[in-house]
């Protein structure tokens, strides 16, 4: 209940956003396997989930288990189509979390008065819609991929961290739940580890509120849900049709979870190539929200600084 009380009011707006975005994603959902929208791994992920195998490093155990569950629960379409529904739900959920995060941030920064409520809801809705229609999120929400689910986990951790930072004395359940989502989300995609940096920063800002017991519980929640990686050696031992590496032994397990074959793609970029890569990233960002969207974002940061 503490979590619910901490969120902005007007849940009907959030529900409307979720249903509208979900309808859009389901309407444009890929009917089966596709390599469009950067979906080169879609066939492998769907087949691995269906057979409960071990996907390419880092293994993606959280995604595989959820995808398998969706393939069993959704009553229509083929296996691949059912798994695509997981991406649509995850993407729509991530959009709603953007709405909640914006509302919470606006309410706690500028006040939750009758005069500002409408403007706050409008601003949060525009932000959520911009995220929903961004080409990358939309494309990853209609195919079998891990990225919309990663967006959902990222949004959940950030919202809970913001909720706790705005009222650290109100209880530690938001922080502990963030640890829970962090551990579970790392079983979906390792890039979630980068969210640990701002989360740690928030904790340092409010370190007086953190007792050894709370820190122990937070680490416990993280470790508990990192245990989802136990799936890999268990299933590798069963010799499924698809099994990358040999996660049944320690060396193969570490090779898989550390994504050893792909480390060079993350940390192997020569320093001389970094400026060009930054330009490419900036171009991707502009194409998601266009120049007007970026201008509005910069304007919002300026307005926030002025208000302080």
Q: What are these model-derived regions, one by one?
A:
Residues 4, 165-166, 194-223:
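Perimembrane helix-loop-helix junctions
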Residues 8-38, 47, 131-133, 189, ...:
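Transmembrane signal-anchor helices characteristic of membrane glycosylation enzymes that use polyprenol
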Residues 14-17, 98-133, 169-170:
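Transmembrane-helix signature of polytopic, membrane-embedded enzymes
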Residues 26-27, 64, 76-84, 109, ...:
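Aromatic- and kink-enriched transmembrane "portal" helix at the membrane-lumen/periplasm boundary
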Residues 48-51, 127-129, 173-188, 200-203:
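Membrane-interface alpha helices of multi-pass inner-membrane proteins
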Residues 85-113, 155-160:
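Transmembrane-helix motifs of polytopic, lipid-linked glycan transferases
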Residues 106, 110-118, 141, 157-175, ...:
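Membrane-interface transmembrane helices that cradle and orient dolichyl/undecaprenyl
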Residues 287-308:
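Hydrophobic, aromatic-rich transmembrane alpha-helices
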């Amino acid at each position: 209940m503490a979590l619910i009380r901490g969120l902005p009011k007007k849940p009907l707006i959030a529900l409307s956003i979720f249903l509208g975005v979900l309808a859009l994603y389901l309407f444009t959902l890929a009917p089966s396997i596709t390599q469009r929208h950067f979906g080169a791994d879609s066939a492998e992920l769907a087949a691995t989930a269906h057979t409960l195998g071990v996907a390419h490093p880092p293994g993606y155990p959280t995604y595989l288990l959820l995808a398998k569950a969706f393939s069993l629960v959704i009553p229509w379409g083929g296996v691949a189509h059912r798994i695509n529904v997981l991406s649509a739900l995850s993407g729509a959920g991530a959009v709603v979390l953007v709405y909640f995060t914006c509302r919470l941030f606006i309410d706690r920064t500028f006040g939750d008065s009758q005069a500002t409520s409408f403007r706050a809801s409008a601003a949060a809705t525009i932000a959520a819609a911009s995220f929903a229609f961004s080409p990358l999120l939309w494309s990853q929400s209609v195919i079998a991929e891990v990225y919309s689910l990663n967006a959902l986990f990222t949004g959940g951790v950030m919202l809970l961290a913001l909720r706790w930072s705005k009222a650290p004395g109100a209880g530690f359940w938001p922080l502990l739940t963030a640890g829970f989502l962090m551990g579970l989300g790392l079983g979906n995609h390792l890039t979630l580890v980068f969210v640990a940096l701002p989360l740690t920063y928030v904790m340092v800002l409010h370190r007086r509120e953190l007792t050894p017991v709370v820190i122990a519980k937070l680490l416990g929640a993280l470790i508990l849900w990192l245990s989802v990686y136990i799936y890999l050696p268990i299933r590798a031992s069963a010799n499924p049709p698809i099994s990358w590496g040999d996660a049944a032994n320690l060396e193969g397990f570490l090779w898989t979870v550390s994504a050893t074959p792909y480390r060079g793609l993350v940390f192997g970029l020569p320093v001389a190539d970094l400026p060009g890569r930054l330009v490419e990233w900036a171009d991707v960002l502009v194409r998601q929200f266009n120049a007007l969207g970026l201008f509005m974002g910069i304007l919002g940061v300026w307005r926030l600084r002025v208000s302080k």
